[in-house]
C-alpha cells in the first residue's frame, strides 16, 4: 500500500512552474495519496503566483488546491508546531507544515533540505 503524503509548498510550486525537479515530484502528485493542503501552503503558493503572474492566476491556483482539501490550522496544532519548531530549529511555516504531516501520519514531501534529517520526510533532490 502506498503511503499518504503531504506536499510542501516547494513541491506545488515546482509542479506549477514545471521546474527541473518536476519528474521527481510527479510520483507524489497522485490525488488519492495527498491528504490535503495546509492553509499556510495555500498562502505560500498563491503569494508566489500572485507576485510572479497575477491575482487572477493565484485565485485559479487556490481553487485547484482546494480540490485536494484544505487542512486548517488551530490552537492545538499551533502548540504542536511550537514544539517542532524549537526541537528541530524550524521556522514558523515549516513547523506548521510538519505538524500537519505528523498529525495525519503522512510523509512530508519537500524540496527543502531543512527537513532532510527528520523522520517520515522525503526530500526531492533531483
Predicted regions and their residues:
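A general structural signal for well-ordered alpha-helical segments in protein cores
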Residues: 22, 42, 58-61, 74, ...
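Short, well-structured N-terminal submotif of metal-dependent ribonuclease cores
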Residues: 1-37, 50-60
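Histidine- and aromatic-rich ligand-binding microenvironments
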Residues: 7-8, 36-39, 90-91, 112, ...
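Active-site neighborhoods of divalent-metal-dependent phosphate/nucleic-acid chemistry enzymes
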Residues: 70-111
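Acidic, PIN/NYN-like endoribonuclease modules and their adjacent C-terminal/linker elements
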Residues: 2, 98-126
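Short active-site oxyanion
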Residues: 3, 32-35, 67-69, 103-107
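A generic structural signal for short hydrophobic patches within well-formed alpha-helices
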Residues: 12-13, 42, 78, 115-116
Amino acid at each position: 500500500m502506498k503511503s499518504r503524503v503531504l506536499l510542501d509548498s516547494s513541491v506545488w510550486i515546482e509542479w506549477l512552474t514545471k521546474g527541473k525537479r518536476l519528474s521527481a515530484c510527479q510520483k507524489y502528485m497522485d490525488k488519492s495519496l495527498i491528504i490535503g493542503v495546509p492553509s499556510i501552503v495555500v498562502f505560500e503558493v498563491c503569494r508566489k503566483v500572485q507576485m510572479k503572474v497575477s491575482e487572477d492566476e493565484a485565485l485559479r491556483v487556490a481553487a485547484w488546491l482546494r480540490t485536494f482539501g484544505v487542512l486548517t490550522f488551530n490552537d492545538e496544532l499551533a502548540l504542536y508546531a511550537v514544539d517542532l519548531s524549537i526541537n528541530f530549529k524550524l521556522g514558523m511555516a515549516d513547523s506548521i507544515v510538519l505538524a500537519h504531516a505528523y498529525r495525519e501520519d503522512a510523509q512530508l514531501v519537500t524540496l527543502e533540505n531543512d527537513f532532510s534529517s527528520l523522520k517520515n520526510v522525503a526530500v526531492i533532490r533531483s
